[in-house]
């Protein structure tokens, strides 16, 4: 677990902040993040991929990825969850998890089915029923942060290449 926290610290330490004198914009951003946090921590949270939303917004200002990375919109993760008929007792593996959108959606829905975030089953879902693998180091850090924000603790995420035989 410490390796994942070290990776998060290293990757996010590279973020450079622009100096601004617009305190209102900063205050609005802080209020917005607080509002998102309140939604994520409620029993009524719908499993939005918060880090995916941030990632897509930030990437609008960067060159297109040469690696062909595509991040799945929320309506597609919801559709896929229903299509494969996941239940609270299933195990979910996303072998190219990106920002963790499918895992976040599955976790949210499975926990809802189990009685909410305070149910005994919720801890089991987070600890042993969700697995994610991501090759790209920075995207892996994004998935770890996303699962951490959603109270998973990034327990079963691994930075590996699922295309290799190792």
Identify the role of each PLM range.
Residues 41-85:
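S-adenosyl-L-methionine
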Residues 1-60:
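Long recognition/docking surfaces used for binding and targeting
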């Amino acid at each position: 677990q410490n390796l994942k926290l070290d990776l998060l610290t290293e990757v996010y330490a590279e973020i450079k902040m622009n100096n601004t004198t617009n305190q209102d914009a900063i205050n609005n951003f802080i209020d917005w993040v607080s509002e998102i946090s309140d939604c994520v921590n409620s029993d009524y949270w719908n499993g939005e991929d918060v880090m995916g939303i941030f990632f897509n917004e930030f990437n609008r200002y960067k060159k297109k990825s040469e690696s062909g990375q595509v991040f799945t919109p929320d309506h597609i993760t919801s559709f896929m969850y229903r299509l494969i008929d996941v239940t609270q007792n299933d195990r979910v593996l996303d072998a190219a998890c990106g920002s963790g959108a499918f895992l976040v959606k599955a976790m949210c829905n499975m926990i809802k089915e189990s009685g909410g975030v305070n149910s005994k089953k919720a801890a089991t879902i987070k600890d042993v029923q969700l697995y994610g693998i991501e090759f790209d180091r920075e995207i892996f850090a994004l998935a770890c942060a996303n699962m951490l924000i959603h109270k998973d603790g990034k327990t079963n995420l691994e930075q590996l290449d699922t295309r290799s035989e190792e």
